[in-house]
């Protein structure tokens, strides 16, 4: 089981490297990694399990965040009532199209690999199309909007060596285009 001690923290070089593409069929090691990353997300969103194991809640976890420099990310995205609206493990994902219109979370973003609060809006495309493979090697493309699009962008950024705060406007962290959708 992945615990907080297993999460690589900001400053580790693996977080700034472009992740290596995986080939199919996935090895048992990478299939287990996918399962373990999803298990962390499920456990972290369960208040009792999270408290017992001192897990910080997460909606996404990329392989580099657990020290594996490969292109894989688990996503478990709830709605505002806690119901899961998107659950998937991406292998070799890429955003193949995105909207011009941006969106962001009203409270900014956080990251399991970043221990401090970094204030500022993180503008991302409101709609994205993600092309990826499943753990079983099935090729897919999915169109996402709003919060699932934000989470997908955050995790795919990890696979490209970027952290959320790289997207914050350094001059004015709370500046937004006037048509940006703010999710509360």
Curated annotation (Swiss-Prot):
Which Pfam family name is an example for this entry? Pep_deformylase
Q: Which residues bind Fe cation?
A: 111, 154, 158
- The EC class name is hydrolase
Which residue positions are annotated as catalytic?
155
Superkingdom of this entry's organism?
Bacteria
Q: Among the record's GO biological process terms, what is one? A: translation
Q: How is the cofactor bound?
A: Binds 1 Fe(2+) ion.
Q: What is its EC number?
A: 3.5.1.88
> What's one GO MF term for it?
peptide deformylase activity
Which keywords does this chain's UniProt record carry?
Answer: Hydrolase, Iron, Metal-binding, Protein biosynthesis
| Reaction(s) catalysed by this chain's protein | N-terminal N-formyl-L-methionyl-[peptide] + H2O = N-terminal L-methionyl-[peptide] + formate
Cofactor(s) recorded in Swiss-Prot or TrEMBL:
Fe(2+)
- Annotated membrane-spanning segments are none
* Disulfide bonding pattern of the chain: none
Q: What does the similarity note say?
A: Belongs to the polypeptide deformylase family.
Protein function: Removes the formyl group from the N-terminal Met of newly synthesized proteins. Requires at least a dipeptide for an efficient rate of reaction. N-terminal L-methionine is a prerequisite for activity but the enzyme has broad specificity at other positions.
HAMAP family to which the protein is assigned, alphabetical: Pep_deformylase (MF_00163)
What protein is this chain from? Answer: Peptide deformylase
Q: What is the lineage of its organism?
A: Bacteria, Bacillati, Bacillota, Bacilli, Lactobacillales
């Amino acid at each position: 089981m992945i615990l907080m001690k297993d999460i690589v923290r900001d400053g580790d070089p693996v977080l700034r490297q472009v992740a290596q593409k995986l080939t199919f069929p996935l090895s048992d090691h990478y299939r287990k990694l996918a399962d373990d990353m999803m298990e962390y997300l499920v456990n972290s969103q369960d208040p009792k399990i999270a408290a017992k194991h001192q897990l910080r809640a997460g909606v996404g976890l990329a392989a580099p965040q657990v020290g594996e420099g490969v292109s894989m990310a688990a996503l478990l995205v709830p709605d505002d009532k806690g119901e899961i609206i998107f659950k998937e493990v991406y292998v070799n994902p890429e955003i193949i199209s995105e909207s011009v219109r941006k969106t962001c979370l009203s409270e900014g973003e956080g990251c399991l690999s970043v221990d401090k609060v970094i204030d500022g809006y993180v503008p991302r495309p409101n709609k994205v199309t993600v092309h990826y493979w499943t753990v079983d090697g099935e090729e897919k493309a999915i169109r996402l909007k709003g919060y699932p699009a934000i989470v997908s962008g955050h995790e795919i950024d990890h696979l490209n060596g970027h952290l959320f705060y790289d997207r914050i406007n350094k001059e004015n962290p709370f500046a937004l285009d006037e048509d940006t959708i703010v999710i509360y």
